[in-house]
Each structure stands twice: as C-alpha cells, then as structure tokens.
Amino acid sequence: MPPFFSPYGIDAISVSIPYWLDLLTVIIGAISGILVARDRHLDLVGFVGLGLLGGLGGGLIRDTMMQQGGVYMLNSPYAIPAAVFTAVLLFMFPEPLDRFPRMLEWTDIISVGLFAVVGTDKALVYHLLPFSVILMGSITGVGGGMLRDVFLGDIPRIFQRSNLYAFCAVAGTTSYWALVSYVGVTKIWAAVVCVAITVGLRRWSLKFNVLSPADIDLTPHVMRRVNKLRRKAQKPGKQPEHNISSK
C-alpha cells in the first residue's frame, strides 16, 4: 500500500502521476463515449469517434489551453490506440454493455473524477496559479463529455440543469489541489479522494434530486426592495433646524 503522506512534502508536486493511471483514465473515458454510441445505435465510425472524444477530448482541450508539455494524445504511443481498440472491441462484443443498464451513469462520473485528477496534476506540475489549476482540472473532467454532446448535436450536459454535474468536477479538482499542494498527501491517495468526492457528490445529488439552479431572475425582488426604500425616503419628515449664530 502506498504511503498516505509524501516523504518529499509539497516538492512532490513536480512529479507526475503514474502513467498507468493516465491510460486507465483514457480507457474509462472511452467506454463512457462508447456507451452513448451504443445507446444511439451508431456504426463503427461513431463508436471510434465517441470513444476518442470521451477518452481524449478533455485532455485535448486542456493541452490546447495550457500550451505546455505537448499534446498528450499525440505524444503518447498508447493513448489513441487504447481508445480505438476499446471502441472496436466493444463494437464487436457489445453484450457486456447491455447487461448493466446504469453503466453509462457510473462510467461517466468516474471518468469525470479521473480526468479531473490528470488535468489538475498536469497544471500542478507546470506550476500554474491556483485558479488556473482548478480550471484546468475541471475542464479536463467535463471536456470530453462536452465535445461528445456537441458532436451529437446535443446541448452539453454541463450547460443544462442537472444533478451537480460540473460542480462535482470542481469539487474533486479542488480537493486534489488542496491535498497535494498544502497537506502533502501522495498523489495516488489524493486521486482516490478526488474520485470519491466527485462520484459521491454526484450520487448524493441523484439520490436526493439536488439540481443546479436555472431560470433565476432576482430583478423583481430587488426592484421591490429598491422601490420600498425609495418610498420610505420620500416620506415627509421633520426638517432639521439650522441655528445660525452671529458672532
């Protein structure tokens, strides 16, 4: 079992997470896209396309914005082949996907948590500012799903009223950043906490039907308060007396 606290403290920020975790994240993200392709009855091209978007889309957006360290999907010898192989394999043998009707729901949010880890970690390795770190982690977490929805002609889920979908990514990203940067927790355990928070918040919001707010208009409430204060200020009152004393 890996140690919980890093013996190097926050100096371990500059050490990237294990490569196998990157690859596992790509595969799970690809499966989430493939499940949507299966649900939409797409052909092999659709399976491969959504597998690539789900597995590599978030990282592509992150790397394009950061412009540091190269583009992971192009530099890695395994990322694209892993996503394509997973898509082709599940296209030919889709029965395991059909056995679990809620598999999409689980793989989708787990992939968000894992992508939040790798996105936050790369931003930490290149010493970005805290808000930039959280932004990169969150975008990496939801970016693949966003591109998938756009390519399917749907409104991305992060822009719709949902069960705290994007908020889960922000919360997981923030936890990873704080644990690694300030507490000195090893990156493996920080990743476990990040995924647990992301998945846990999502499951909690689904269980209790907690939805992100939408169609809010505070204008009438604010205007009523303003009008009330204005009427109160306009009421006639006793004018203060000004005593002018002559010297």
Predicted regions and their residues:
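The first (N-terminal) embedded transmembrane alpha-helix
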Residues: 19-32, 50-53, 172
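Cytoplasmic-side transmembrane-helix entry/capping segments in multi-pass membrane proteins
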Residues: 45-53, 76-81, 101-112, 136, ...
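C-terminal ends of transmembrane helices
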Residues: 30-40, 63, 88-101, 146-157, ...
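Short, structured motif recognition centered on aromatic/hydrophobic residues
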Residues: 49-53, 60-66, 135, 139, ...
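Helix-coil boundary and interhelical linker segments in multi-pass alpha-helical membrane proteins
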Residues: 1-15, 64-74, 118-132, 178-189
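Structural signature of hydrophobic alpha-helical transmembrane segments
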Residues: 14-26, 71-85, 129-142
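Small-residue-rich segments of transmembrane alpha-helices in multi-pass membrane proteins
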Residues: 51-57, 107-121, 139, 164-177, ...
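Short, highly charged, low-complexity non-transmembrane loops/tails of multi-pass membrane proteins
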Residues: 213-243
